[in-house]
Structures are given as structure tokens and as C-alpha cells.
Amino acid sequence: MNHHPNFHHYHRSRRRRAKDATWTAYDPYWLEAERAYSDHCDRFRNNATTPRIIQYPCRRGFLMPVTAAEVRATTSLVPAEFLRGLQAIFLLAGTRKQLKGACGDLFSYGFYWADCVFLHPFPLQLLCSIYSHAPKPSDLLDYARVGAEITTESAGTVVRFDRRSLKKLYLQDVLIHEIGHHADRANLGHPKENEAYARWFATEYGFRCAG
């Protein structure tokens, strides 16, 4: 069990922008995604109608709770017009630096960038986490609706995931949220507007459609 005095999950990591303060040469999530993109982008098509799904073997210490087939089945529930131009969905491997800093404030489930969705594997050490300061109510609601166990104990708020709840989190929330950023990519307004749309998108096409 991991105790996090000020631990913040980036439940739906930000859509990457050129001026994103965390988009630096030291961000291990960005570095892994950039390498994966560079390995495959020369095979992308300008007129993509459905995304490629590219899965890397998961590193020790991580769990990728979804398979390429499950991702494909989930995206089939999204109206086709929202998938046009989406080049790829990457299921990444994780890195040692990510694992070392898993309890820090840069933890990321995934993000949208360059017409691609990148999903990061989940550190096994975070399957059970203690928050001495309770997560935001909206995050607790998201954890609860995927079936995570949430309890209040003497040390703080405890969130426990099993494989089933983590799979639901990735498929119905994180993945569809990031596809929502793709659907809303022409909107260059305030980031809060982008996040509100992506959150609505995940509710509409992740939870309501997938049940």
C-alpha cells in the first residue's frame, strides 16, 4: 500500500500543447511517447479513417489493463466521424523513470498529441493508494463508477483498484476522454473548455454507450 501525502492522479492527462509547462525534456511520459511516435509516424496516412493500435510489451512493475482487441472493440462504439484523422492509439510499455516517480505529481494515465492517443501502463504499486488529502470529488466519482473500492481510514482516503475496475477506467474513461480531445482538436480555446468537452465525451461515449 502506498501513502501519498499530496498525491494527485492526472486522471485524464492534459492535451499536449506547445506551451505546456510539463512538456519538457525531463518528462518521462512525453519522452516515451515521442520515441514511440517517431518509430511509427512514417507509416501514417493522411486520410486515416480508423486508428492503428500499437501495443508494446509491458515492463516489469507495470500493468497494461487493456489489450489491442479491447481497445478496438471500444472504439467501435464511437461514431466514425470522431475517429477520422486519428492516426494511432499507443499502448506503451512504461519506463524505469516513470516507475521511480510513480507517486509524484507527473503521473499520467495518458494523453492526446499529434493526432494520436498514448496510454501509459499503470504502476502495480498504485493498485492500493492512501491519500492523506482526499482527491477531488469529481475524481472520486470517476473511481467509484468504474468499481474501485474507496474507503476512509485513519491514514486517509484509500483507493483500491483490481484488474476489472482498472480495465474499465482505461477503456471507458481514459481512452474515450483522449479521443474526445481529438474530436475537439479544432477548439483552441481555454484548456478548461477542452477538458469539459473531453469529460462529457467520456461520459457520453464511454459510460453510456459501453454500459
Residue ranges and their predicted role:
Residues 1-145, 149-164:
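A metal-dependent hydrolase signature that marks the N-terminal structural subdomain at the beginning
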Residues 74-82, 179, 205-209:
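Hydrophobic, Leu/Ile/Phe/Ala-enriched alpha-helical segments that form helix-helix packing faces
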Residues 191-211:
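Post-HExxH zinc-binding segment in Zn-dependent metallohydrolases
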Residues 126-129, 183-184, 191:
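Short catalytic/ligand-binding loop motif for oxyanion handling, primarily in non-cytosolic enzymes
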Residues 173-186, 198:
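Active-site recognition of the HExxH zinc-binding catalytic motif
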Residues 108-110, 180, 198, 202:
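Small-side-chain structural scaffolding
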